[in-house]
Amino acid sequence: MEGPEVSVIAAVADGEYQIFTPARDYKRLSDGDKGLNTGGMGAVASRSLISGELLDQIEDEVIRPSVEGLTKDNMDFRGFLYAGLMLTPDGPKLLEYNCRFGDPEAQAVLPLIKGDFAAYLMSAAKGNLMDGLIDFDNTNFSWKNFVDFI
């Protein structure tokens, strides 16, 4: 497969989810996307990484079915669902799942969140993604950009 990668991270609690700003990490050791893969040399989080239509497709084909599957299987999942995707000419392809906030993606996504993130996490841990505790500029992801270098 060929294409750029993107990370779509969602907070999940008892069948509910909220998608955060899409992010992309940069894994290669050297400039020009050369060298060995690392744990991440930096990341960018931006609304402009993918279109709203593509995010809707990822939600419809990956995030929502995953959360519905957890609910169907009676798995009381509360945490982050991290979908690592490759954007191919045939559409987004799931490369990996993680049940954590990606790093270094978190370092680029978290500064975009407004509000009481600690209270949001506590609420999610109790099974409720409370609207109003955090804000993404009144959309499900921010129009702002953030770059993180390690």
Label for each model-derived stretch:
Residues 1-106:
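Internal nucleotide-binding/catalytic subdomain
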Residues 59-81, 99-150:
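Active-site "cap" helix and flanking loop/linker of ATP-utilizing ligase/carboxylase catalytic domains
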